[in-house]
Amino acid sequence: MSNQRIRIRLKSFDHRLIDQSAQEIVETAKRTGAQVCGPIPMPTRIERFNVLTSPHVNKDARDQYEIRTYKRLIDIVQPTDKTVDALMKLDLAAGVDVQIALG
C-alpha cells in the first residue's frame, strides 16, 4: 500500500462544514503516520437563477437566487493500513459529499 495514493474530493454547499470535515480527515491521516497534501481549495461553482415574481406583467420584478458549491481536494501520499482503516471508520457530516479514488 506504500506506493499508492488516495485522493479525496469533498463537495458541500456550506463552507464551514467542508472545512471541518477536511480538518478531521487530515488529522486522522497524520495521526496514523501518512503524508498529507492539502486540503486544497478548488474553485467555487456559483449557479445563479432569476425568477419572475409576477405571474402576469411586471417583467422588471425578479428575485435572484444562487447556490454555491464548495470543493476541497486532499491527497494522502503514503497511506498505511492503519490510515485506510481509520478513514473507513471516520464519521463525517451529512452535508458533505465524499469521493475517494485510489491511484
Curated annotation (Swiss-Prot):
UniProt keyword annotation of Cell wall biogenesis/degradation present: no
GO cellular component: ribonucleoprotein complex; ribosome
GO BP field: translation
InterPro entries for this protein: Ribosomal_uS10, Ribosomal_uS10_CS, Ribosomal_uS10_dom, Ribosomal_uS10_dom_sf
This protein's UniProt keywords: Ribonucleoprotein, Ribosomal protein
Keyword Ribonucleoprotein: yes
GO molecular function: structural constituent of ribosome; tRNA binding
Family: Belongs to the universal ribosomal protein uS10 family.
Subunit structure: Part of the 30S ribosomal subunit.
Function: Involved in the binding of tRNA to the ribosomes.
The name this protein goes by in its record: Small ribosomal subunit protein uS10
Taxonomy of the source species: Bacteria, Pseudomonadati, Pseudomonadota, Gammaproteobacteria, Moraxellales
Gene name of the record: rpsJ
